[in-house]
Design a protein with these regions (language model features):
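Structural motif corresponding to alpha-helix initiation and N-cap regions
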Residues: 97-100, 169-170, 195
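Conserved SAM/SAH-binding loop
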Residues: 165-173, 190-192
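S-adenosyl-L-methionine
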Residues: 1-142, 147-152, 161, 174-181, ...
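Conserved protein kinase catalytic core
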Residues: 121, 146, 172, 195-197, ...
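Short, surface-exposed basic-aromatic patches at helix termini and helix-loop junctions that form
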Residues: 128-131, 154-157, 202-206
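Structured loops at beta-to-helix junctions and adjacent beta-edge loops in soluble globular domains
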Residues: 70, 79, 167, 214-216
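Conserved acidic-Pro-Pro-aromatic motif
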Residues: 134-141, 181-186, 192-239
Length: 239
């Protein structure tokens, strides 16, 4: 049986939405409502599709720029490397807001932002636009993301204040002037590679830095052991 075929004549189908001259967004909504009602096993996927659709609509309505929050005015080109579902919360200034607020509340002497896993520059550029940071250093593995990041930096008028580097390895700190690490904050988000990237040597070199690490221990079978090892490595220099 076709999954969109009604079980009885009284049941609405996604196609009915088209007959009522509904908007594209409304048609998508009706379709997903039908899926959730008749195929609950598909619900997680349907919710994610709807979330992405709404997010894209919010992003387009605000001219593809952040409209609220500390990064207000941040413009990002099409081709974002983040998921579609993140665009809306970025636009509303809610994307990882607790992390943003925490970074902005750091002592004012910290004016250098370093990011490993910079993607398109939401943090690296946004923090410069906030007026809180003077410069950013962004490590990004993907060549396409680095190109988009460079374009976004020019788009927002901060290209002269941002340094874009390639993939960070365990000795990434050697690419930075030690003087640049004295009044800096480091954000690491590399989808599970943090356990291979950060060790005793890097924590020692970054002893004067505030460090934020997005942990992905759950992606590794031995995630708990990796997490414990990371804690031991940083215990001498960071709390």
């Amino acid at each position: 049986m076709d999954p969109f075929q009604p079980k009885d004549k009284g049941q609405r189908t996604p196609g009915d939405a088209l007959d009522n001259n509904l908007s594209y967004a409304q048609t998508i909504g009706r379709t997903l409502e039908w899926i959730c009602r008749n195929h609950p096993e598909w619900t997680p996927a349907a919710v994610e599709v709807r979330r992405a659709e709404l997010s894209r609509w919010v992003w387009q309505q605000h001219g593809q720029q952040v409209a609220h929050g500390p990064f207000k005015g941040l413009r990002l080109m099409d081709g974002l490397q983040w998921g579609e579902a993140d665009k809306g919360v970025m636009c509303l200034g809610l994307y990882e807001r607790e992390v943003v607020d925490d970074i902005l509340a750091l002592p004012t002497r910290i004016t250098h932002f370093i990011e490993i896993g910079a993607a398109d520059g939401y943090y690296g550029i946004g923090l410069l636009l906030s007026g809180r940071f003077q410069r950013s250093t962004c490590f990004e593995t993907e060549a396409q993301s680095r190109q988009i990041l460079a374009h976004n930096a020019r788009l927002n008028g901060v290209a002269a204040r941002i340094r874009i580097l390639g993939e960070a390895g365990p000795s990434f700190h050697e690419e930075l002037d030690p003087r640049d690490l004295r009044d800096a904050v480091l954000l690491v988000d590399v989808e599970g590679r943090e356990f291979d990237l950060l060790g005793e040597a890097s924590f020692l070199a970054l002893s004067d830095c505030v460090i934020y690490i997005e942990l992905h221990d759950w992606v590794h079978p031995d995630g708990m052991q990796r997490l414990e090892r990371l804690r031991r490595c940083c215990s001498a220099t960071h709390t």
